Amino acid sequence: MATLRVDEINKILRERIEQYNRKVGIENIGRVVQVGDGIARIIGLGEIMSGELVEFAEGTRGIALNLESKNVGIVLMGDGLMIQEGSFVKATGRIAQIPVSEAYLGRVINALAKPIDGRGEIVASESRLIESPAPGIISRRSVYEPLQTGLIAIDSMIPIGRGQRELIIGDRQTGKTAVATDTILNQKGQDVICVYVAIGQRASSVAQVVTTFHEEGAMEYTIVVAEMADSPATLQYLAPYTGAALAEYFMYRERHTLIIYDDLSKQAQAYRQMSLLLRRPPGREAYPGDVFYLHSRLLERAAKFNSLLGEGSMTALPIVETQSGDVSAYIPTNVISITDGQIFLSADLFNAGIRPAINVGISVSRVGSAAQIKAMKQVAGKLKLELAQFAELQAFAQFASALDKTSQNQLARGRRLRELLKQSQSNPLPVEEQVATIYTGTRGYLDSLEIEQVKKFLDELRKHLKDTKPQFQEIISSSKTFTEQAETLLKEAIQEQLERFSLQEQT
């Protein structure tokens, strides 16, 4: 009979116990009771936070939005077709966040910061919360640096500064996206990082914008965040916050950023869809009660930092679509009240061939001339006044049969100034050329020309000025002031061009 050796057994047991390294972890698990229309209801998950990420057994992720006494309402970040009733759901213990890095420049990504341009994965070592608090009052400073859009009508009369939030509002097909994309094109060489967020748009429209950026060399400093019309409502709702998180990454590194939200009407509609499916009580136009907070917490993240924080900035240009020019609808009034001004695009002006179709009368920038260089202030004041007088006189002229000579001259000048504001798409002008163009119009040099000749004359003048008087651009760009020397050079160029132009017309 074999004898039991107690010390040997003891040694084996000790070795086995020492080798045992199984970790015990606590996981917050729930079970699906209902799923459909991008919403899942879960029982369990007692310790879940509002906005926490959850993971379903088949891999889909979701965000906990409704925390009710009996169940949790989850919005799905995917189609959720494989999720089954009774399957397990695990809380991750994390709020939604995305990776961030310089490697995102030049890429097209979705709301989860995953690349969708077929150019491989993006390597990032850092991450940021999709929703982070806006900078406080103490960390900000007032807007004082101009952000040039390259559009004469905006830079002269509705100036935008770095750190400002300026709404672009108008009916569909009035050129809202064109104004935003031209602004991005004009940032070339300005050391501004641009983020273009496309929400609920057709894939063909987004592809067209990306192609334009590639052709004009703007993709080098631009990130495109795109969620198309066929994307789940949750991802359309998240896309602007993803864009803001990427822009913030650069802003906190003392860089200047520009972010376009195209457009926030579709984000509000996606949020309304989610809220109604979660059975939240509807309010005005069936939007939930917190739809104002949806946009205010997004747009308040745009800021101009003070010198202690490195003077970085994030300029936001949200776009909102109106129905038949109705700016008193719920979403337009909300966003107008949050932003620092609005650029109103009119369908009537667009159809009349005035493009960009900016209605200068009801557009406003609440930052004003603080966001203009001195040279622009010197020439733009007269332009605003003359266009306002022209609009008033034009309305009166419709009913008056005979007008005196002064009024006729004023109307003729106004028509030429309106012609001067027209610009073709993807053709932004540097501020030096804008100053020259406005000066030519407001000083009456265009009065002798036919309206049809104005565009051709100005194009040739800008080229002539660039070729023969390069000192003009140097003076404006270095001193930011319209000096006497600059004015003399410009007058000479205008006179030379008028003579050349009259000879051309005669031949």
From Swiss-Prot:
Site (Required for activity): 362
PROSITE patterns (alphabetical): ATPASE_ALPHA_BETA
Gene3D superfamilies listed in its UniProt record: 2.40.30.20, ATP synthase alpha/beta chain, C-terminal domain (1.20.150.20), P-loop containing nucleotide triphosphate hydrolases (3.40.50.300)
Membrane-topology descriptor: Peripheral membrane protein
Residues annotated for ATP binding in this entry: 169-176
EC number of the protein: 7.1.2.2
Keywords, ordered alphabetically: ATP synthesis, ATP-binding, CF(1), Chloroplast, Hydrogen ion transport, Ion transport, Membrane, Nucleotide-binding, Plastid, Thylakoid, Translocase, Transport
Coiled coil region boundaries: none
Annotated CDD domains: ATP-synt_F1_alpha_C, ATP-synt_F1_alpha_N, F1-ATPase_alpha_CD
Localisation per UniProt entry: Plastid, Chloroplast thylakoid membrane
Molecular function terms from GO: ADP binding; ATP binding; proton-transporting ATP synthase activity, rotational mechanism
Gene Ontology CC annotations of this record: chloroplast thylakoid membrane; proton-transporting ATP synthase complex
Catalytic activity: ATP + H2O + 4 H(+)(in) = ADP + phosphate + 5 H(+)(out)
Top-level division of the source organism's lineage: Eukaryota
SUPFAM superfamilies: C-terminal domain of alpha and beta subunits of F1 ATP synthase, N-terminal domain of alpha and beta subunits of F1 ATP synthase, P-loop containing nucleoside triphosphate hydrolases
Subunit structure: F-type ATPases have 2 components, CF(1) - the catalytic core - and CF(0) - the membrane proton channel. CF(1) has five subunits: alpha(3), beta(3), gamma(1), delta(1), epsilon(1). CF(0) has four main subunits: a, b, b' and c.
PANTHER family: ATP SYNTHASE SUBUNIT ALPHA, CHLOROPLASTIC (PTHR48082:SF6), ATP SYNTHASE SUBUNIT ALPHA, MITOCHONDRIAL (PTHR48082)
Recorded family membership: Belongs to the ATPase alpha/beta chains family.
Function summary: Produces ATP from ADP in the presence of a proton gradient across the membrane. The alpha chain is a regulatory subunit.
Classification via NCBIfam families: atpA (TIGR00962), PRK13343.1 (NF009884)
Protein's name according to its UniProt entry: ATP synthase subunit alpha, chloroplastic
Organism field: Saccharum hybrid (Sugarcane)
Gene encoding the protein: atpA
